[in-house]
């Protein structure tokens, strides 16, 4: 009788090509997503060594990091030039490399273009039980549909392009179980912020986290993708949520998803992708969903999380000297004083978007708060950036764009946008941004930018009041 296995172990075992004496395994990669920032050197390496792409049919290229979110075509439909030379060069390289190596390429002006981690599941290219890699740290996002997905470096991008495999050490396993019902105003983003604050930014180091429990199962696929997206912020290699009927309903009929008898066979296999009764994890964390409130970050690490009803902590309250020093440094950068009520912190900028929170459910949540309201006079810059052209079209069909525009926010084209300072969307130095993205590192949204991570509804609430606000106060 085989021993009970976790979901991670099942997917791992199914992809082992070769096991080595030191425990390292050669793993087959089912799907490879490529974008413009981490791929130029990889393609150059292939070209220099005379190699081809081993499985172009398992590879999909999408530009997302550097693309501007302002209009990309003029009135005549001609493509507008990219102002930044480095960005223009990277985008041009991907546009040249993908067809040269026989890789499917979604053009920057194609209707289905978007953030790679939104496009993958949306197109059905990402599937349960698959191994998925991308030269991007937030590849863990695809774990929301039950895929083992993780980010890789540029040299590994080249290796996967050439061989469709990677040499990897197996990870430890960790369960984060969230049981019970969440309260009003609490979203998937609040759940993962709370988890990150609980386990810490290094809590999952060396592990793959499986998110379980009734609160996780109750989430939509959009919510599950948000959870897995930020597994890396808890230090984990990847995040996983077991596929179920919600997953199958989401994927059915998508362009790259299996069809007909292949679909039936796939679902039959996907149903086996659950952790066996009796399987053990290396680490287990249990969280009561009732303890989770609308949350916000105060510092420069994703673990710096408090409820919106809380206050800025005093560095002296940290017993660990390194954390005490980090907290003091964070507060100096963020321009905050210990004891300040989070609801008294003003914000000048609002960003609703990123691979964490730019799907249709996220935009609906923000629009529900903004409907019939206007952004506060103190908010200088507020943008809504859909995760893909298909999300944008759906939002416009539902009239969400009009709600955002009428509220005084800008409605943009799809892309990574202000999540990271690699395109024109940057937060000015010394100013704050209520952001639905995943990282609040020093300079992440621009040199000197001060980031507060929140949910889409919380970002919308901040837009209305001009300060960090408990969205529950604005809910009907």
From Swiss-Prot:
Its cofactor is [4Fe-4S] cluster. Its EC number is 4.2.1.33. PROSITE patterns: ACONITASE_1, ACONITASE_2. GO terms for molecular function: 3-isopropylmalate dehydratase activity; 4 iron, 4 sulfur cluster binding; metal ion binding. It catalyses: (2R,3S)-3-isopropylmalate = (2S)-2-isopropylmalate. SUPFAM superfamilies: Aconitase iron-sulfur domain. Transmembrane segments: none annotated. Pathway: Amino-acid biosynthesis; L-leucine biosynthesis; L-leucine from 3-methyl-2-oxobutanoate: step 2/4. [4Fe-4S] cluster binds at residues 355, 416, 419. Catalyzes the isomerization between 2-isopropylmalate and 3-isopropylmalate, via the formation of 2-isopropylmaleate. Heterodimer of LeuC and LeuD. Belongs to the aconitase/IPM isomerase family. LeuC type 1 subfamily. HAMAP family: LeuC_type1 (MF_01026). This is 3-isopropylmalate dehydratase large subunit. The lineage of its organism: Bacteria, Pseudomonadati, Pseudomonadota, Alphaproteobacteria, Sphingomonadales.
């Amino acid at each position: 009788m085989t021993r009970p296995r976790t979901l991670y172990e099942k997917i791992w075992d199914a992809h082992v090509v070769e096991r080595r004496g030191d425990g390292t395994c050669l793993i087959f990669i089912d799907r490879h997503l490529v974008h413009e920032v981490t791929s130029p050197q990889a393609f150059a390496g292939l070209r220099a060594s005379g190699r081809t792409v081993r499985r172009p049919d398992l590879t999909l290229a999408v530009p997302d990091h550097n693309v501007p979110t302002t209009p990309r075509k003029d009135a005549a439909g001609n493509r507008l030039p990219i102002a930044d030379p480095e960005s223009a060069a990277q985008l041009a390289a991907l546009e040249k490399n993908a067809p040269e190596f026989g890789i499917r390429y979604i053009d920057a002006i194609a209707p289905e273009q978007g953030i790679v981690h939104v496009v993958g599941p949306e197109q059905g290219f990402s599937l349960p039980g698959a191994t998925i890699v991308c030269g991007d740290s937030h590849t863990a996002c695809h774990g929301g549909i039950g895929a083992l997905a993780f980010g890789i470096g540029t040299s590994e991008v080249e290796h996967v392009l050439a061989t469709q495999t990677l040499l990897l050490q197996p990870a430890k396993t960790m369960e984060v179980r969230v049981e019970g019902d969440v309260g009003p105003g609490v979203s998937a983003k609040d759940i993962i912020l709370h988890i990150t604050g609980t386990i810490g930014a290094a809590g999952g180091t060396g592990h793959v986290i499986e998110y379980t429990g009734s609160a996780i199962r109750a989430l939509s696929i959009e919510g599950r993708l948000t959870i897995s997206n930020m597994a890396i912020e808890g230090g984990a290699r990847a995040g996983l949520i077991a596929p179920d009927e919600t997953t199958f309903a989401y994927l059915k009929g998508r362009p790259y998803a299996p069809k007909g008898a292949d679909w039936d066979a796939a679902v039959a296999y996907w149903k086996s992708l659950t952790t066996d009764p009796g399987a053990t994890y290396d680490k287990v964390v249990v969280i009561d969903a009732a303890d989770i409130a609308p949350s916000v970050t105060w510092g420069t690490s994703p673990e710096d999380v408090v409820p919106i009803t809380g206050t800025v902590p005093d560095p002296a309250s940290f017993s660990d000297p390194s954390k005490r020093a980090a907290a003091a440094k964070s507060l100096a950068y963020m321009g905050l004083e210990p004891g300040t009520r989070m609801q008294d912190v003003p914000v000048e900028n609002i960003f609703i978007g990123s691979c964490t929170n730019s799907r249709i459910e996220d935009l609906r949540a923000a629009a529900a708060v903004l409907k019939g309201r206007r952004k506060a006079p103190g908010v200088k810059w507020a943008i809504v950036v859909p995760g893909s052209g298909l999300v944008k079209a759906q939002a416009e069909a539902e009239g969400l764009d009009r709600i955002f525009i009428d509220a005084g926010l800008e409605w943009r084209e799809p892309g990574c946008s202000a999540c990271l300072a690699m395109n024109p969307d940057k937060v000015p130095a010394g100013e704050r941004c209520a952001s639905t993205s995943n990282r609040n590192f020093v300079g992440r949204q621009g040199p000197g930018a001060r980031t507060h991570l929140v949910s889409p509804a919380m970002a919308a609430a901040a837009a209305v009041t001009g300060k960090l606000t408990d969205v529950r106060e604005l809910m009907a």
